[in-house]
């Protein structure tokens, strides 16, 4: 009725695609006269729900859905007598109503007793909670503070309830659950998807800039299944800026910083260019740009200064009316610079007014969701505006394609679009900025080149987003997990799992804990609180392969192992508890799962083997007659603590001191006379020992302590848990969607279904991970550890069944997969594919439903196993032929921390192995690859490596991390200097250089680029070359673009790249021929050649 009174035009229902839900807080002044005749005033704060959407033609619309309320649940202690109609309940209700600040919320209908099932534990089937509804978020949090006594400073006494119960003992739920999530789950509406409305009314006054705006009733809205596979017409645009930045550590805050160009590429084919330039050059610039055949619909906006440019950008973006704006690396650069410049020029509010809402200003939000407090320049941010999604396409690629070596726009465009950026350098950009307001033929030509470069960057970003259908992926994940699109994009797994679990708990009438983020929520220990303690259990089972070349290898895989384990064993928060946990159920109602965990203890198989290898190594050392210069260094992970750092050279029984450098710049020894680079050539015994040692060190580095325990949990059988039902629902939905894909012919509909089934799969597999995250939203140690233990038991059971019942040997097994040795008998007529499928079916029959062992379609004629997660195979086709190319799995050819040269040099010797070459041919192939590098015929682009650079903090300052009590330089842990305080006062520059020298080489190079005012690192991965240095402390890497722009600044260290081939190819040689000196024989001439060159260079310098 209220909606009808506030509107004057009515129309029938319609379908809309909703992509953004917003709850708007409105205030209304009220006044009254009390008994004493005093005029009193107060504010009524209400929550109004809006839905920003598009219709079937792509026109934007806003649905105003009226007032909504937010809920809160109060949990009293188990022994507290809360009975309906009792005297205690009446007193409790009166006390709770006193703590409610809003007059309208004090109605008794807003404070009710409800029965709900607790999420954690196997106690009572239901428990009594107090449900309270509020008309505002402010009123809800004020109520909590009053009950706990935190509404005043200093804190006062908490509220007192009957039976001497203090308000501090009450636990609150749903405090941090967003109001829109509560409302949408209650009304079964999707966060992204098609909805069907009831009768629509046009309001008298419009509050948004949308094409259409209606008022309608929230209960009349329902999800539209008929249009589920219809792709919405979403208008989007990509933008890019060009700016002069003088201090990259604080971009945009320097007095001489300036944004002088912004480009916008709209999905309808329109381009916009906003540039600071003389007004009379607009026509010439348009004519110059339109000579390019790709630019036909361009609008140029010339501004006289930077303030005008920022205001014009705001005006143009609003006039476009797009539902999403995106860019490449905008969160870490473009948005940061624009916000900094708007702050310096006092136009922040105008700049942020880029959304559809007229009455709600935009705000700056970090990608973690924080909108309050001081935001550091190093924090990634985005502009949070109503009805317009702010997306970073680079972040989409980082989360989707995690194995790319780098995430620069140039590289990603070349890989996915077969396109490239325009060849504009930093020098060109700086030259244009220095002559920005000049008019000459050279300046006009340069202005046109840079403008085209900026426009192309925006176009490439838009094309990449469309090419990979990232928006479709985001909307499908948002629909399935009941999570806002922007939250799916930025906050990843834990937040999605929280929203999904809340939806399921609300549907099943389960009280879900959400006390995370609320300090001192309750002083008493609860089950949920104990779940956040550090987890202590061993990981998945891995059977290491015996290195070697195998023929006829098949693979089997447990389909969705962890999700199906949850279904098969009824694993949930409310069904899995410790063995001795008290319960109202008898032992007959439980299933007991027992196992042993041994990590780092004397029973750990890794430690047992390591102890055995140490004894063997000691015996070998006693009987070895070779001359010892010092302690042999085995790997970079196992360095001697005392004594000279010497590397053994097994060649002609001679020894020499040498330097062995690795990616992190560490050195075993130093020798200024001989700068010889040679890798440690290890025997198979030493290699095996180093591999075991590496496992131990990795376990310690991950924070795992020594664990030696017999574990046991009990699982309730009489009550179905929420997690099994949720996982089963997701898997069945995926199966149904994949079935529908077979009958769909429309490419757009098929693409939507494909993204939908992938979202179902990712979500189902993420549930196990969310229970095991100790710092997650909903941790559960018991579920995580029993799921992992059952996974180990399942794969071990499968291996044993294959061995005992079918006489099949398992070569290698990891987590949920196993590689088996098939019969290699030419006289046998048995089809290997049929045999593997029958084996999988037989093993499946022994497992608990719905667990299934699936046979992979690929049979490998040959497989070279090198170690854990490291093997190379050649596929066998059904006609008896073999594949020409090899399948590379986690060797240097697919790892992104190796250069293209190392990858290309590694492949020819391996191909020789699969061609049944001799040992001499293998050595010759290695020598040929090295010779190509020594002849300097390899371009520097092939020598480029990439490495991750984490956050370096705000202004490169040392900060104490209160959580770990460690001194941090950004995200890097460093040791604090003993004289830190004195040096900070007397010589801060030296102190900064000292800490920088303690960082890894890529991080040092990133800081050096900042000091040089070079462009920031895109995607958190820096490209560099390894170069020669004269001193140990010098940085042995150089950024690739700086190396190209400054020829002669450094010399490529060829021997470093040759050394990178030693360990990987030695593994191949040991696996095939059991020889460790193959690579050493191949590279020996190059080592001596490099040594002679170094001596000649030294003598030449001395003679000069």
UniProtKB/Swiss-Prot annotation:
InterPro entries linked to this entry: DNA-dir_DNA_pol_B, DNA-dir_DNA_pol_B_exonuc, DNA-dir_DNA_pol_B_multi_dom, DNA/RNA_pol_sf, DNA_pol_B_thumb, DNA_pol_palm_dom_sf, DNA_pol_type-B, RNaseH-like_sf
Entry-linked SMART domains: POLBc
Top-level EC class: transferase
UniProt EC number: 2.7.7.7
BP terms from Gene Ontology: DNA-templated DNA replication; viral DNA genome replication
Origin superkingdom: Viruses
Keyword Metal-binding: no
UniProt xrefs under Gene3D superfamilies: DNA polymerase family B, C-terminal domain, Helix hairpin bin, Palm domain of DNA polymerase, Ribonuclease H-like superfamily/Ribonuclease H
Substrates-to-products reaction catalysed: DNA(n) + a 2'-deoxyribonucleoside 5'-triphosphate = DNA(n+1) + diphosphate
GO-annotated molecular function: DNA binding; DNA-directed DNA polymerase activity; nucleotide binding
Recorded family membership: Belongs to the DNA polymerase type-B family.
Function per UniProt: Replicates the viral genome. Host DNA polymerases cannot substitute for the viral enzyme in this process.
Family annotation (PANTHER family): DNA POLYMERASE CATALYTIC SUBUNIT, DNA POLYMERASE DELTA CATALYTIC SUBUNIT
Name under which the protein is recorded: DNA polymerase
Organism: Spodoptera frugiperda ascovirus 1a (SfAV-1a)
């Amino acid at each position: 009725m209220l909606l009808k009174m506030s509107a004057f035009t009515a129309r029938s229902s319609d379908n809309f695609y909703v992509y953004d839900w917003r709850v708007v807080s409105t205030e209304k002044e009220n006044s009254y006269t009390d008994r004493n005749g005093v005029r009193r005033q107060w504010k009524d704060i209400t929550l109004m729900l809006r839905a920003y959407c598009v219709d079937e033609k792509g026109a934007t619309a806003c649905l105003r859905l009226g007032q909504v309320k937010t809920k809160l649940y109060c949990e009293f202690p188990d022994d507290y007598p809360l009975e309906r109609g009792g005297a205690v309940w009446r007193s409790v209700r009166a006390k709770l109503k006193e703590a409610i600040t809003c007059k309208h919320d004090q109605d008794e209908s807003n404070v009710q007793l409800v029965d709900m099932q607790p999420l954690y534990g196997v106690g009572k089937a239901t428990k009594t909670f107090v449900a309270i509804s509020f008309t505002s978020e402010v009123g809800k949090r004020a109520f909590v503070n009053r009950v706990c006594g935190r509404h005043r400073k200093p804190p006062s006494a908490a509220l007192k309830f009957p039976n001497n119960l203090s308000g501090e003992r009450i636990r609150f739920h749903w405090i941090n659950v967003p109001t829109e999530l509560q409302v949408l789950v209650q009304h079964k509406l999707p966060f992204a998807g098609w909805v069907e409305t009831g009768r629509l009314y046009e309001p008298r006054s419009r509050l948004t800039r949308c094409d259409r705006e209606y008022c309608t009733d929230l209960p009349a809205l329902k999800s539209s299944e008929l249009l589920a596979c219809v792709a919405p017409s979403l208008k989007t645009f990509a933008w890019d800026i060009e700016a002069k930045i003088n201090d990259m550590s604080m971009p945009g805050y320097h007095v001489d910083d300036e944004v002088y160009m912004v480009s916008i590429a709209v999905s309808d084919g329109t381009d916009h260019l906003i540039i600071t330039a003389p007004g009379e050059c607009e026509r010439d610039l348009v004519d110059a740009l339109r000579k390019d055949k790709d630019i036909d619909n361009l609008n140029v906006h010339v501004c006289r200064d930077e303030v005008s440019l920022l205001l014009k950008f705001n005006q143009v973006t609003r006039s476009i009316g797009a539902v999403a704006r995106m860019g490449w690396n905008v969160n870490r650069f473009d948005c940061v610079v624009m916000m900094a410049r708007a702050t310096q020029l006092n136009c922040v509010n105008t700049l942020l007014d880029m959304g559809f809402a007229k009455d709600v200003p935009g705000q700056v939000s970090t990608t973690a969701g924080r909108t309050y407090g001081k935001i550091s320049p190093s924090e990634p941010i985005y502009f949070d505006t109503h009805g317009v999604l702010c997306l970073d396409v680079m972040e989409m690629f980082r989360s989707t394609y995690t194995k790319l070596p780098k995430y620069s726009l140039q590289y990603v465009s070349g890989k996915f679009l077969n396109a490239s950026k325009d060849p504009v350098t930093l020098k060109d950009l700086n030259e244009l900025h220095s002559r920005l307001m000049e008019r000459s033929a050279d300046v006009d030509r340069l202005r046109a080149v840079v403008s085209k470069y900026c426009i192309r960057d925006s176009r490439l970003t838009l094309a990449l987003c469309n090419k990979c259908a990232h928006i479709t992926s985001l909307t499908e994940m948002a629909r399935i997990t009941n999570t806002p699109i922007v939250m799916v994009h930025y906050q990843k797994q834990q937040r999605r799992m929280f929203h999904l679990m809340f939806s399921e708990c609300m549907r099943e009438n389960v009280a879900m804990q959400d006390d995370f983020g609320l300090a001192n929520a309750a002083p008493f220990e609860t089950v949920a609180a104990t779940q956040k303690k550090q987890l202590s259990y061993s990981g998945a089972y891995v059977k290491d392969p015996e290195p070697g070349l195998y023929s006829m290898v098949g693979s089997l895989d447990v389909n969705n192992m962890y999700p199906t384990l949850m279904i098969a064993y009824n694993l949930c928060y409310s069904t899995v508890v410790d063995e001795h946990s008290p319960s109202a159920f008898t032992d007959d109602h439980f299933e007991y799962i027992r196992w042993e965990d041994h990590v780092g203890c004397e029973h750990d198989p890794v430690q047992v083997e390591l102890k055995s290898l140490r004894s063997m190594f000691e015996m070998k050392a006693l009987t070895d007659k070779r001359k010892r210069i010092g302690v042999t260094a085995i790997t970079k992970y196992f360095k001697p603590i005392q004594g000279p750092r010497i590397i053994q050279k097994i060649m002609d029984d001679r020894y020499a001191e040498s330097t062995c450098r690795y990616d992190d710049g560490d050195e075993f020894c130093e020798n200024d006379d001989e700068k010889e680079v040679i890798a440690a050539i290890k025997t198979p015994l030493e290699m095996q020992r180093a591999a075991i040692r590496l496992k131990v060190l990795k376990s310690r580095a991950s924070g795992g302590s020594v664990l030696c325990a017999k574990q046991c949990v009990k699982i309730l059988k009489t009550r179905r848990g929420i997690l099994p039902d949720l996982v089963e629902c997701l898997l069945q939905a995926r199966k149904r969607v994949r079935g529908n894909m077979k009958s769909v012919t429309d490419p757009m509909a098929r693409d939507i279904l494909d993204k939908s089934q992938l979202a179902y799969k990712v979500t189902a597999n993420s549930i196990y991970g969310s229970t095991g995250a100790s710092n997650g939203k909903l941790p559960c140690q018991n579920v995580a550890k029993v799921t992992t233990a059952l996974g180990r038991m399942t794969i071990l059971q499968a291996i044993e069944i294959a061995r005992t019942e079918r006489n099949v040997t398992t070569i290698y097994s990891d987590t949920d997969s196993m590689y088996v040795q098939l019969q290699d008998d030419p006289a046998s007529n048995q089809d290997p594919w049929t045999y593997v499928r029958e084996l999988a079916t037989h093993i499946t029959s022994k497992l608990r439903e719905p667990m299934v062992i699936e046979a992979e379609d690929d049979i490998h004629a040959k497989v070279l196993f090198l170690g854990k997660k490291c093997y190379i195979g050649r596929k066998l086709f059904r006609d008896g032929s073999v594949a020409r190319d090899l399948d590379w799995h986690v060797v240097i050819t697919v790892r992104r921390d190796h250069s293209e040269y190392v990858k290309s040099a590694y492949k020819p010797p391996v191909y020789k192995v699969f061609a049944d070459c001799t040992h001499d041919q293998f050595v010759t192939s290695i020598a040929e690859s090295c010779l190509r590098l020594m002849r300097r015929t390899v371009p520097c682009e092939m020598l480029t490596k990439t490495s991750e650079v984490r956050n370096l903090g705000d202004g490169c300052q040392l900060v104490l991390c209160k959580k770990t009590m460690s001194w941090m330089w950004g995200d890097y842990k460093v040791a604090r200097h003993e004289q830190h305080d004195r040096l900070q006062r007397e010589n801060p520059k030296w102190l900064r250089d000292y800490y920088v020298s303690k960082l890894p080489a890529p991080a040092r190079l990133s800081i050096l680029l900042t000091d040089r005012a070079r462009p920031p690192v895109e995607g958190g991965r820096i490209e560099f070359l390894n170069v020669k240095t004269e001193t140990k402390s010098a940085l042995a890497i150089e950024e690739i673009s700086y190396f190209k722009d400054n020829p002669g600044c450094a010399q490529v260290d060829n021997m470093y790249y040759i050394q990178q081939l030693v360990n990987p190819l030695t593994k191949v040689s040991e696996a095939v021929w059991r020889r460790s000196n193959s690579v050493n024989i191949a590279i020996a001439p190059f080592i001596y050649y490099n040594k002679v060159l170094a001596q000649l260079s030294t003598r030449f310098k001395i003679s000069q």
